[in-house]
Swiss-Prot record:
Gene3D superfamilies: 5' to 3' exonuclease, C-terminal subdomain. This protein binds to 23S rRNA in the presence of protein L20. It comes from Mesorhizobium japonicum (strain LMG 29417 / CECT 9101 / MAFF 303099) (Mesorhizobium loti (strain MAFF 303099)). This is Large ribosomal subunit protein bL21. GO terms for molecular function: rRNA binding; structural constituent of ribosome.
Length: 223
């Protein structure tokens, strides 16, 4: 006899004595756990399907081991922002051996210590709420970080120059430079190689672009 069960948001086809890795169940090694979400059961070609679960059907399993899955690496990179993030995750797993497939409300031979699907459902419901809370908190953190971040350079007093006169600097680039404290041709002309490297690291402009603007700014600053 086999059964199709649902636990931890996944479906498994199981039979007696099968070894199975499911999402972590809070139980000790040797404990019996109950899986009451039985979607179908059958033997050979005779299969009974539930709507969605089969009434009175129950699968019990013995906890064999508590462990973790292999590490999954998530790598995120944002173009032209020099932002890279690497996150590793290891899913907690419980290895169980299927003990019995019970039908018609039959009672298990051994009393279960815990119901597997109950724990899995609580974890599954908690995960979206936690993710939503983090998602709502993220924009606030970004706004705080942006507010707290100081410009790369100190803007001089006086009237700013029109940086768009320099070939290669458009309105958007000029605005970005102004926000970082660069507002005059003289500033651009006096940029050191160290300053160029700083802009290259923190702004979406290449070192070659900045050096070209610096040379143009030197000529404009003389006028």
């Amino acid at each position: 006899m086999f059964a199709v069960i649902k636990t931890g948001g996944k479906q498994y086809r199981v039979a007696a004595n099968d070894l199975l890795k499911i999402e972590k169940v809070e139980a000790n090694v040797g404990d019996i756990v109950e899986i009451g979400h039985v979607l179908a059961h059958g033997e050979g070609e005779n299969v009974t399907f539930g709507a969605p679960f089969v009434d009175g059907a129950l699968v019990t399993a013995e906890v064999v081991e508590q462990g973790k899955n292999r590490t999954v690496i998530a790598f995120k990179k944002r173009r032209r922002q020099n932002s890279r993030r690497k996150i590793g995750h290891r899913q907690l797993l419980t290895t169980v051996r299927i003990s019995e497939i019970l039908l018609g409300g039959a009672k298990p031979a051994k009393k279960a210590a815990v119901k597997a699907e109950a724990k899995a459902e609580v974890a599954a419901e908690a995960a979206p709420k936690e993710a939503k809370a983090k998602k709502e908190a993220a924009p606030k953190a970004d706004v705080t970080a942006e507010t707290a971040a100081a410009p790369l350079f100190k803007a001089p007093k006086g009237e700013p120059d029109d940086l768009t006169v320099i070939k290669g600097i458009g309105p958007v680039a000029a605005k970005d430079l102004n926000e970082q404290g660069i507002i005059t041709f003289a500033q651009l002309a006096k940029l050191t190689d160290k300053d160029v490297a700083k802009i290259d690291e923190h702004m979406p402009f290449s070192a070659d672009q900045i050096k070209d603007w610096r040379e143009q700014a030197k000529e404009l600053a003389k006028k």
